[in-house]
Amino acid sequence: MDLNYNNEERRDLYDKERRPIGKTIGKGDEIPEGTYILVVLVFIQNDEGKFLIQKRSAVKNGKYATTGGHPVAGQTSKQGIIQEVKEELGLEMVPEKVQWYYGGRLDGERVFWDDFYYKVDNIDLTSLKLQKEEVESVCWLSADEIMELKEKGEFFLNHFEEYEALIDWLKKEKV
């Protein structure tokens, strides 16, 4: 049963234990009390150890961040992030290479989140097809360069916390 029939992009609703409740909401709709939606993001790293970072469009706050979004109704988190990367960057990901590394629940925001890691060979950034409504530009950045952006207030803070979790995971997993 849908709460709102007017939006094209629907999102599944979950209970506090992350069980689907059989209802959806539209993009931009308020999340009903006692329910949650999924949020996903991915850090893409090349063989030089740099991360593919996007400068968000001005309507999306214009800060640097990684690729993320919301799975549409019926998608798993992994399917959702693969679709987001294709839509925002024009990059086809190999599902078997997409690795989950971190996730949880934020009660105040009513979201569950899943973070993924994807290792690639060097990609020619000019070959990417950016979704201009979401992404102004992309670049490869080192860990030090990401830290500099954070210190200048230019890196999307929510994504920086996820980045720190990734660095911890990479050290443990030796990926």
Predicted regions and their residues:
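Residue-level detector of beta-strand face positions
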Residues: 12-13, 43, 103, 117
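The catalytic Nudix box helix
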Residues: 53, 66-100
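Acidic, metal-coordinating catalytic segment for phosphate/diphosphate chemistry
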Residues: 1-41, 47
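A glycine-rich, hydrophobic loop/mini-helix early in the fold
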Residues: 39-70
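Short, solvent-exposed loop/turn elements at beta->coil junctions and helix N-caps
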Residues: 27-31, 101-106
